[in-house]
Amino acid sequence: NKGCATCSIGIACLVDGPIPDFECAGATGLGLWG
């Protein structure tokens, strides 16, 4: 998913679409936040 690439940025993922990118945000978030 190209959205996943955007997820790497962080906030951009949520702004673009928190629902479809939530999975990516969660995976990337765990690495960044945890």
Curated annotation (Swiss-Prot):
Cellular compartments annotated: Secreted
InterPro entries assigned: Subtilosin_A
PTM notes: Alpha-amino of Asn-1 is covalently linked with the carboxyl of Gly-34 to form a cyclopeptide. Thioether cross-links are formed between cysteines and the alpha-carbons of other amino acids, Cys-7 to Thr-28 and Cys-13 to Phe-22. In forming this cross-link, Thr-28 is converted to D-amino acid.
Crosslink position(s): Cyclopeptide (Asn-Gly): 1-34
Location in chain, cross-link 2-cysteinyl-L-phenylalanine (Cys-Phe): 13-22
GO cellular component: extracellular region
Keywords, ordered alphabetically: Antibiotic, Antimicrobial, Bacteriocin, D-amino acid, Secreted, Thioether bond
Keyword Secreted in record: yes
Record family assignment: Belongs to the bacteriocin class V family.
UniProt protein name: Subtilosin-A
Native organism: Cytobacillus firmus (Bacillus firmus)
